[in-house]
Amino acid sequence: LKNILDAVLNTENLITNTNTLSKKSNNTFSLIGHSMGGYIALAFAEKYPQYLNSFGLFHSSAFADKEEKKEVRRKAIEFINTKGAHTFLKLTTPTLFAKAFTEKYPEKVSALMENGKNFTNATLIQYYEAMINRPDRTAVLQNFNKPVLFIIGEHDQAIPLQSSLQQCYLPLQSHVHILSQSAHMGMWEEKDKANNILLDFLDNKL
């Protein structure tokens, strides 16, 4: 998990490396990112749209944080500095899931919380600072003339349903799917449905 997060935080290097790979191939590809991975997909689409035949936001948003959201993240950073990353993740991880899922599969949520031991305070703080500082990229959605996938969790507290729907009107071609039993972790909460959505989208774009 830490290695994945380090890659996410180093967005510019990741975009550059993906661009290098793209230049070695004559084919375009689809790029789909979950949560902060969606910010990377947007950044890549902004810089290298010619290499994409489509892209997708899975529980992610092109909007920059509003000031009140930034303040919540700053308070999270204070908590991490005081109590530690693992304590913070034990408190916040359950909120990523719909209540029905946490009640039915507490062991899965616990396993994810256990993985949180791999995060250092510094790494998690970097993650939050990156989210605070990310720019608004709604113009990317407006200017991209190929298909854009949106997978939205009806019970998502991190990116509320109404906020997610607002961005769906921006692209020329939007493919919108709402997971009615999911919050922010639809690939776990409604795994089969999420996989089918992804496969159907990719089958039509590759």
Whereabouts are the PLM-identified features?
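Hydrophobic "lid"/C-terminal helical patch
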Residues: 5-8, 21, 92, 128, ...
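Acidic beta-to-alpha connecting loop that harbors the catalytic carboxylate
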Residues: 154-157, 181-183
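Catalytic active-site module of serine/aspartate enzymes centered on a nucleophile-bearing elbow/loop
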Residues: 172-206
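Short beta-strand/loop motif that positions the catalytic acidic residue
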Residues: 144, 150-152, 156
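Short alpha-helix in the alpha/beta-hydrolase fold that links the catalytic acid
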Residues: 146, 160-169
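Conserved alpha/beta-hydrolase catalytic His-Asp/Glu region
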Residues: 65-71, 83-143
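Conserved hydrolase catalytic core segment
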Residues: 26-66
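Conserved acidic catalytic loop of the alpha/beta-hydrolase fold
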Residues: 1-29
